Amino acid sequence: MTASTTPGVWQDLAQAIHEEIEAGADGVVVMHGTDTMQFSASAIAFMLETPVPIVFTGSQRSADRPSSDNVMNAVSAVEAAKSDCAEVLICMHASESDDRCALHRGTRARKNHTSRRDAFETIGADPLGEVDYESEDHEITFRRDYQHRGEAELDLDPDLETDVELVKFTPGAGPELLEAVDDAEGIVIEGTGLGHVNTDWIDHIEELVDAGTEIVMTSQCLDGRVCDRVYDTGRDLLDAGVIEGENMLPGTAKVKLMWALANTDSVAERIRRPMAGEITERSVPVE
């Protein structure tokens, strides 16, 4: 079960992929369980600069079932690994039909259904591309710009700070939740709406930040951007030292914080700066 995946597994995987590309691989396919695929794909995207495609895939239904998606997903992933898109992708069914596989950026994907074959979605947009499984040559199309094959130099930065926690705020939750993780090097909070928590949390957050803990605010909303400058609570959170996570998915933000804590002294700046498509451009310019 991929629920048993650890950051050490991500590091071993990144090293193995790096070795294959260094040895001349023109693309890499990673067969992975679906439950934590988005976390592993995000980790590889942050740890590894790649000049070739790295494609994660798996199956929602086992090979002994007539509705298994394993062959189609695997074939489509191989085609994606032969493409010009040198990014970390997730390749899974685009619908319940056996016609197309979607190509999601690993840092923007989320498993949104427990059992459907098209469980994965790109949050906030259509998938980056798709593989037409029914066409004779499994034609691949892309909807948006991407990093082209050969544009990046192969580079590996596998260090991770594993003492990072993800805390979900809910109405009535007290700051005791933070006390349970106050020894962590970093904390990602899933706040409400634009990135809010109860005002009772703010003093404790400030104490943690003053003690050296990096705290990143994300939103429980599936789409949209954190903005803590709109309401008093948000401004107080910024004054307390919270880092806005822009529109990163909470799980992706946790993985990025793990990477940033281990690889840079400017954690806040690195969190706010896009690295692997995890933060998208604003649809409306902000002055």
Where do the model's predicted regions map?
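A short helix->loop->beta-strand "cap" motif at the edges of active sites that frequently abuts
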Residues: T50-P53, A86, L208-E214
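Short acidic, glycine-rich surface-loop motifs adjacent to enzyme active sites
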Residues: E22-M37, D183-L194
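Short Gly/Thr/Asp-enriched flexible loops that form oxyanion-binding sites at enzyme active sites
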Residues: V30-V52, D200-I205
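Accessory alpha-helical/coil subdomains and C-terminal extensions
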Residues: A102-G186, V284-E287
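Short beta-strand segments
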Residues: V30-H32, V55-G58, L89-A94, K168, ...
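C-terminal non-catalytic interaction/assembly regions of soluble proteins
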Residues: L194-E287
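Internal gly/pro-rich beta-alpha loop/helix module
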Residues: T57-S135
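ATP/NTP phosphate-donor binding region
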Residues: M1-E20, D203, S266
